[in-house]
Amino acid sequence: MTVFPAGQQFQTEGECLPSYQVRLACRAGQADTTAGVAPGFVQGNLAILPEKYAAAFHRFCQLNPKPCPIIGMSDVGNPQIPALGLDLDIRTDLPRYRVWRDGELIEEPTDVMAHWRDDLVAFVVGCSFSFEEALLADDIPIRHIERKVRVPMYRTNIACTPAGPFAGPMVVSMRPLKPADAIRAVQITSRFPSVHGAPVHIGLPQSIGIADIANPDYGDPVPIAPDELPVFWACGVTPQAVIAAAKVPFAITHAPGLMLVTDLKNKHLAVL
């Protein structure tokens, strides 16, 4: 039985955690958007890079903890990250991947077995899906879950702090909320800094460079009612944007909205 530093224990394979069931479904090609699945378990964004670029990317994440909070990292060439889950294989356990060459998206496979190399390092970055459980528990509605679509995500004019070849704008996710719910959401998500924490912006999307909120750069659009405000959180798709801008010769990421579901518990991420 594996124990990770917070003291949480993973169940044995026979007991089959809901998170492990999701990963098995991914291996079988039967999974899609992970919003709302395996309640209680931490989800993560994925970035896989050659070892040559790993140190600079790690530094980028350290300098930009809001969009890029690292929750796990593999050894060089090892597709498993035991601290994140039982029998977890980073090559097969997400619903869909993106493969990049020289900054260009070339493929979106359901596994990356054929692309795996001995020099690759995998980074798992915290995902806002993890704090959504806490919002729902406080009766704060989440539009993309209600509509069973991917959360809308946007590139902004908020610059990230550069590191090595990695630089570019922050990507944000958006959830429309009534003002009272937005205030409560700030309070709730502030407790979860390892999965983006409090919002980075509320209202006035044009002021952070979003020209048309009805057309997200990633994910799916959701309606905003007249009595609602768009609330924006730093997003773990930011690494995809900076990896593409850096034109790294080879990289693998998750497809936006289709995350790695780990065996870590959301409740263990709260700082208060």
Curated annotation (Swiss-Prot):
Gene3D superfamilies linked to this entry: PSTPO5379-like, PSTPO5379-like domain
InterPro entries cross-referenced by the UniProt entry: D-Glu_cyclase, Putative_hydro-lyase, UPF0317
Entry EC number(s): 4.2.1.-
Record's signal peptide: none
Keyword DNA-binding: no
Keywords carried by this UniProt record: Lyase
Coiled coil: none
Keyword Transmembrane helix in annotation: no
Enzymatic class: lyase
Domain of life: Bacteria
GO terms of molecular function: lyase activity
Family recorded in the similarity comment: Belongs to the D-glutamate cyclase family.
Name used for this protein in its record: Putative hydro-lyase RPD_1846
Organism: Rhodopseudomonas palustris (strain BisB5)
Taxonomic classification: Bacteria, Pseudomonadati, Pseudomonadota, Alphaproteobacteria, Hyphomicrobiales
